[in-house]
Amino acid sequence: MTEAITEAAVASSEEVSEERDDLGPLELHDSGTFQQVVNLLDIIDSESAKTDTTGAGLDMRKTLASVIIMEKATTEPSVVINTLIRCLQVPEISTQRKVNIYNILQDIIQQEGELEEQCVQRLVAIASKEMREIPEMEGYMKAEVASDTLVALSRNHFSLVMYELQHHLKPLNLTDEFVIITLAKLANGNVFEFMPYMGITLATIFTMLRLANEAKIRQAICSAMETFCETVQFYLKHLEESVYPVMTEEEFALKVFPMYRYFVTVWLRHYNPEVKLGVIKSLKPMLGLLLPNDDLREQVYDYIPLLLAEYQGSLEVLFVTQVLRQILELSVTTNTPVPQMQLHTIFTELHVQVCNKAPAQHQYSSQNLMEMVHCFVALARSYPKELMKFFFSQMETNKEAVRVGTLNLIRAIVSADEPRMSIRAIYLAIRVVKNTISDTRSKVRMAILHIIGQLALCGYQERIKGWGLKYLSVQLTLSTYKLTNRREKFYQRDLEERMVHKVTMDTVKIITSSVSGMTTEFWVRLLCYIMETDYVEALTPICISLTNLAEHQLHGQDVDVSVAGKSRQVDLPAPQKLLARLLVLMSSPYKGEGRGIAMLNLLRTLSQSIAPSMADMWELEIALLVRYLEEHTEFTWDQKAWEDKLIQFLRNSLKKTRGSSWSLRLSKELNNQIASFDSPSLEKGFLYRALGFTLATGLEASKVEVLLLELLYKTDYSNDFDSEGVIMCFGLCARGQVKTVLNVLHDFEERIQESEQSWQISAWRKDHPWRRETVKSALMVMYSCVASYCHPQLLLNLVDSPITAKIIHHYVSSCQDICLKMAFMKSVVQVTKAINNIKDLEDFHFAQKTTLTSIIVAVIKAEPTDNLVSPVRALAMEALSHLSKLKPFYSTEENSELMDISIHSVISLQLPGEDNESIKTLYANALSSLEQLMESLLQRQLDPKGLQEMVQLLEKWILSEKEWEREKAVSLHLYLMWIYVHSTAVCIHLKLGQFGTMVGLIAPCTCDAHQRTRMASMNVLSSLLDLHASQTCSLWGPSKQKELEKCKGDLQSTDVEKIFCASSRIAKVVCMEFSCDEVVSLIQKLCENTGAMNLQHDKASVTWIAFFLQMRAKELEDKVAEILSAILVHLPVVDHPEVRRLLIDGILLLAHHHQETILTSLLRQPLPMESHLAEVWLAVSENVPFARTMLHSLMGRLQSRLSPRISATSKADIWRLAAVDPLMTLCTIHLLIQKLDENDKLPDFLPDLIYTLLLQLGSSHRPEAAPPVLKMWKLVHTTPLPEEMNLQRVTIKSMQLLFKRVKSQHLAHTLDEQAVWDLLQDGGTFLEGVSLLARLCMQHVEGHRQRLAELVLRGMDSEVLSCRISSTAVCFMSGPVLYQEKLLKPAALLLEKGADQEEDEALRVLSLRALGNMALGAPKKVKQYRKVLLEKCLGPLREPVSNSVTAEGMEALTKILAELREGDVGSSFDAMSEQCRIFFDNESELLRLKAFILFGKLARVVGMSKKHFFKGEVKKAWIPLMLHSQDPCSNAAQACMATMFQCVHFWGWKSLEHPSGPSDTATDDKMTVFQTTMCSILTRKKPAVLYRFLLETMAYVKNNLSRIRIAACNLAGIIMKQMSTHYLKKLDFPALRNSLQELQLDPDPGVRRAALETLTVLDSCSQHGFLASPQGMS
C-alpha cells in the first residue's frame, strides 16, 4: 500500500506541476509517521465497512484512529497533511476512503488554522479537481466533502481558495455545479471578504443563465442567488463594519434585477417543480433588495401576473403567497399601491384560494390561508371600496363556501391590528354582511355571528345595536329549537346546529359584557329563555349574560330611556317559579359549562326582586355555595353533599318566610316542575327532595294533605325512579308532618281498596294486574321511609303499629313476588335502622321482631342455592343484621342457625362470569350483606367460643371441593377475623389449642389453586398471628414481617412450585410462635382435613406438618405420642402416595428426635400389622442408617425383657422401658430385615441380632418366664392372629432372613440338612438346636465370633434364667474362640456359677457340658483350670440331683481327663473312681453309660502313684463290669466291655489281656469264655477273691434289669463251677438255692432259664460234697 501511495504521489506531482509550475514533487520526510497514518486510515476504512454492513453506529475503533491522526497533526501538521494528500492521489482509492480523508483534513484545518502555503496550494488544487469531476452517486458525496474542505481552507487562506474558484468561473462559460455551490458557501461564511468579488460573481453568473439548461445547475444557481442576496442584506445592515470597498444598495439592486427578471420570465415556467421551487424561494431575498428601490418597484409590479399564474400549477402555493404578501405589504408601507388594473386579477386569484379547498398535495394550506388573509388586509388598506365591491359581488353567488370564505375575510379585516381599519371600510363591510343575514345555512350563520362578536370586541357596538342584537336573538331561539327537536337521522345537521348554538352563546356573552344601553326587549328574551328552554346547555352563558345585564340595570348604568323612571327592581316572572326553576337546575351545577355558579350569581343579583326578605341571607349563603363550586370540579364534587347544601339553603330561605304562604306557593311550583323533567334525572330527584322539605314546613295541614294525595295519585309506580322519589318526598315530609303523612297514606289505602273492585284508577286496571303489587311495594317502603325520617320520640310509639304492622300486612296479603320481597326487606331495613339510630332506647322491645325474623328466614331458605336472580337474599341478610341489634336478642342457638342458613345461601353460589356485570353486582351485594350479618351476630358473642363456632360453621366451606365456595368462605373468615381482632376491647385469651386449630384449618389454603383464595388465606393467617401476638405479648421482628410480606407477594404467582415454596417459608417463619400444645392442635387439624379436598390441599397440609416437625421436633417430647396418634389415625384414609409418604416422613422425622417414644407408640399398635403401619416401617427400611438404628432399638426392647427392670431416669427411658408386645417387636424386626438390601450383611449388628433372637426364642419356650404384660396385649388384637404369627415362628423367620445374608450356601444347606430350624421351634429340642446353631456359627459366620462370644458371656451373667440357659447353650467352649479372644476366664467363672446353681437343671447341665468342652476348645488351658473343672464336675457325682446333671458331670470329667495326667488330677482321682463305681448299677442307662466311659478314661489316666489304688477300685468294680457287659443298653454294654478290657491289665495276668477264641464269635460267647478264664485264674491264684465275687454276683440276681439278672445267674454258675471245694463249703447253699428258686417266678423266661441252669450247677456242687480242684473244674 505504501509503495502504491508513493508512486501515485510522484505521478500526481508531475500532473499537478503541469497545472502549477511553482509546485515541485513531494518528498517523504518521515516514513514512520507516514506508515502510521496509512495504517490508521486502513482501520477507519475497515470499521466504516463494518458499520455500513451491520447498520451499527460509529465504531469506537474508527473514532480512536481519527483521534490519533489528529494528535499526530498537532505535532507534525505538514507531515500528516502531506501523507493525507498522497493518499488522496492513489488512482484506485475508494470514495469512502476519500471522504474519510477529507473529513480528517477538515478537522485538522479547523484545529491548526494557518498551514504551509505549499500544502494549501496542493490541497486546493486536488480538492478543486475532485469537486469539478462529473459527479456520480458516490462522486457527489466526494465533491461535497471536497467543497467543504475548500470552505474550511478559506477561513485562513481565502485568497488562494477564491483564486482557484474564480479561475474556473468565466463569463459565457457554464461552470461546474459545485463551483457555484462552493462560492455560495464562501459568501455565507466570509461575508466581508467576499463582497469585493460579489459584483463580478453576479455578473459572471448572469452570463451563464442562458447556458444553464439542466435542472441541477439551475437549482444550484437559484440556491446560490438566495444565499448571495441574504449575504448582501446582512452586509448592508452591517456596512460600518466593512473595510473593503463597498457597493451601494442601489448598485446591488441593479445587479440583481436582471437575474430576477430572468428567473420570473424564463425559469419560473420550467416544467421541473424543484426548479420552480428554487426560483420562488430565491425571489423573496431578491425582492428584499429590489422593492425598496422606487424605480425598480414599479417594474416588479409588472411581473405580478406571472406570479399569480403559478396558482394554477402544481407548485406549493404557500411560497407564492408569501412573495405576494411581501409585495402587497411593502406597497402599503411605501404608499405605492399596485396598479389598479391588476386588482381584479389579484382579488380573484386570492379569493379563489381562500374559498376553495386546497389540493391534497399542498401540505401548507393552513399557513397559506393565513398569508392570504394578510394579503387581503393589505389590499383593504389600499383599496377598501374596490375590495368590498368585489366581496359584494362574490356574496351574490349564493355558494356557501364563497359566502363563508368572504365573511371570514371580512371578520379578519374588521379585527385587523394597528393601524385600525378605516370607518368607511367597516361601514362597507357591514353592508356586505347585512346583505347575507337571510341565509339559513349553519356555516354562514356562524360566520355572521363571529362578525357581530368581533365588531363588539373591536369597539363598534353602536354598529350592531339594531340589526345585530335582533339577529342574535333570532339565532338563539332558532338554534335552541332545532337542538331540542333534533332527529337521530340528521346527526350531521345536529352537530352543525350545536356549533351554531355555541357560537351564539359566545356572542351573547361578548355582547352582554361589552354592550351598554341594552334594550329591555333583549333582557326579557333572555329571561324567558331560561324559564322555557329544554336545552339546558345554553343556560350558563345566558345566566352570565343576564347577570351582567341585571347588574347594569340595578346599578343604574346606561339605563334605557324606556325604563329610566322605573324601580330598581328588574321585571321578573313569579318569584317562586323562578326560584324553583333555578334551584332545580342548580342541582347539576357543572352541566352546560358550569351553570351552577352562573345561576347562583344571577340569583344573588336578583335577590331583591325575588324575595327582599331573603336578600341579606342570600348574599352570604350564595357566596359560600359559589366558593364550594369553585373549589371543586365535575370530577371532584360530591352530588350528595351539594344537594344537601342546596336543601339547607332552601330551608334557611323558608325560615325567612315563616308565617306566610310563601313556602306553600313554592311547593306548588316545585310540584308543577316535576312534569318538566324526565325520569330518571338528577334534577327530578332533587325536585322530590326539595318538595318534601318544603311540604314539611307547611303550616296548613289540609293543604299539605291535598298536595300529597295529588302526588300519590299522579305517580306512575311502575317507574322505579318516580316511585322512589315520591317515597323520599313522603319521608322528608314526615319530619314535620308525620301524622299528616300517615293520615294521607291511610286515606289512600282506603280509597284504593274501594276502587279495587271498580277499577277506577290506573293502578288497578285489568290489563295490568301486577300494578297492585307495585303499589303495595311502594306503600311498604313509604311506611319504612316515614319511620326513618320520623322524630325519634314519635317513632317508638308508632313503629310497632301502624308502621311495622302495615308493612307486614301488605306483604302477607300479596303474591310475594321478587319485587314485593325486595320492598319488604328494604322496609324492614329502614325501620330497624331508624330504631337503632335512636340513642336512648332504654328497655324498648321490638314486638314484631320474631314475626319479621321468621318471614325473612323463610325467604332466604326459598332462594335457590345454585344461582342468583335477585338481590332478595342480600336485603334479607341485611335486615337480619339490623334486627339482631334490637331487643329481645337472639339466643346462641338462634345465632348459629341464622349464620348457617345465611352462609349456605351465599357461599354455595357460583362466581359470576366476567361479562355479566349485573350478576357480579348482585353477587357482591350478597357477599357484603352476609359479612354484615355475620359481623352483627358475632358482636353478640365476641369471645373465643363465639369465634370458634363461627369458624366451625365455615370449615366445611373452606374445605369444599369447589373453588368459588372456598374463596368466599376464606374471604368471609378474613372479614370476621378482622372484626374480631379490632372489636375485642379486652384481651380474652383463646382456648388451649384453639389457635393451632384455626391455623391448621387455614394454612393449607395458602397453596390453593385460586389466587384470591391464597391471598385471603394469607391475610387470615396474618390476623391470627397478630391476635396471638397480642395475647402472648410477643413482638414480630422486622425480618419476620418482611419475610411474610415477601411470601405474600410470591403467593400471587401462578407457578405452583413457587407457591408451595412461599407457603413453606410462611410455616418456617411462624412455627416458632406456637406453643407445644398449639403445635399438636395444628397438626391434628391438618391431619384431620387431609383428604377432605384435593391433592394440592393435602400436599400443603403435609408440607406444613413437615416444617413444624422439622423446626419444633426437639421441643415436642411430651406431645410426640399425640402427634403420632393423629397421623396414624388419618394415614389409612390418605389415598395419594405422595401425601402418604410425606406424612410418613413426618413420623420418621419425629423418630429421629424421639426414637423411643415413636418406637413404643408404633409397637403398641394392634396386630396383625395394618398396611399403613407396614408402610411406615417400609419407609424406615429405605433409610438404611436409620433402619439400623431402629433395629438396634428393637433389639434393645427384646433384650430389656430379658434383663432386670431398671428405674427410668428420663422421659426417653420411660418410653423405652414401657411395655410393648414382643410379637409386634418381632414382626417389625422381621419386616425391616426383609426389606433391607439383601446384599447388606449387617456386619455391625448381625451377631447382636442373632443372639437377641435366640434369647427371645429361648424365652418363648419358657412361658413361665414371660412377663404378665403379654396378656394385656392380646386384648388389642381385634381379629384372631394367623397361626404363623406366633413368637417362635416369627423369630425363626427373622433368623432365617439373617442367615441368608451370610451368603454361605454350605451353612444354609447344613441348617436345612440338620433340621436346625425344626429343633429350635420345638421346645424339647430347643437347646440342642441352639448348641448346633452355635457350632455352625463358629464354623461359618466369620468375623463375628468375638462379638458373639461377648454377647454369650453377657447373657450367661444375666439375671433372667432363660437368658442364662440360652447363653450357656450357645457357649462356645468347644471351640477356640473364647481362648483366642481371651474370654476363657470369665466364661469359666460364669460356668462355675452356673454349675453350682440349683434352680434349673438345664442350666446346670449346660454349664457342666460347657466346662467339659474346654478340653475341646482350649485343651491347653484344662490343666490351668483343672481344680475348678474337677471340683464342679465332681459335684453332681457326690451329690446327685438329677440323672442329666450327673451324666453331664461324668461326661465333662471324661473330656477333661483326656487332657490331664494322673498328677494333674490329684486327690480328685480317688473321688472320681469311687463316685464313678456308684453309678455302674444305676437305673439310668445314661448314667451307667457315662460311668463306664469315665471309668475307662480313669483307667487310661492312672499312673504309678494311683495304680495300686485303682487296682483295688478295679477289683471292686469288676463284677459290675462283667455283668454290665451284657447291659440291656447296647451303648452301655459296649462301653462297659471296653472299660472292662481296659482294666484287665490291672490284674497283672497276661492271659486275660488277650482273650482267646476267634474274633468272629458272638459277644455273649466271648464274654462266657472270658469269665470262665477269669474264674479259673482266680481259683488258682486268688480263690478268696473268687469267693467274694460269687457272693457279690448273687446280690445282682435281684437287680431290676432282667439282662443283669440273667448275667448274674450265668456268672454265678461259672464261678461255682470254678470254685474250689474249700470255698464251696463256705457257701450257704440254702440261701443260694432260695435266691435262685425265687427267680423261677421271674416274669422274664430268660431269667427263669438262667436261674434254673445255675440252680442245677448249685445242686451239682452240693451233691458231690467235695472240693473240686481247679484243674478238674476247667
Curated annotation (Swiss-Prot):
Keywords: Repeat. Residues 1-26 are annotated as: Disordered. It holds the Pfam family HEAT_Maestro_2. HEAT repeats lie at residues 73-96, 97-133, 195-234, 254-292, 382-419, 424-461, 573-612, 615-641, 642-679, 739-776, 993-1030, 1221-1263, 1381-1420, 1627-1674. Transmembrane segments: none annotated. GO terms for cellular component: cytoplasm. The keyword Repeat applies. The keyword Repeat applies. InterPro entries: ARM-like, ARM-type_fold, HEAT_Maestro, HEAT_MROH2B-like, Maestro-like_HEAT, Maestro_heat-like_prot, MROH2B-like_N_HEAT. This is Maestro heat-like repeat-containing protein family member 2A. It comes from Homo sapiens (Human).
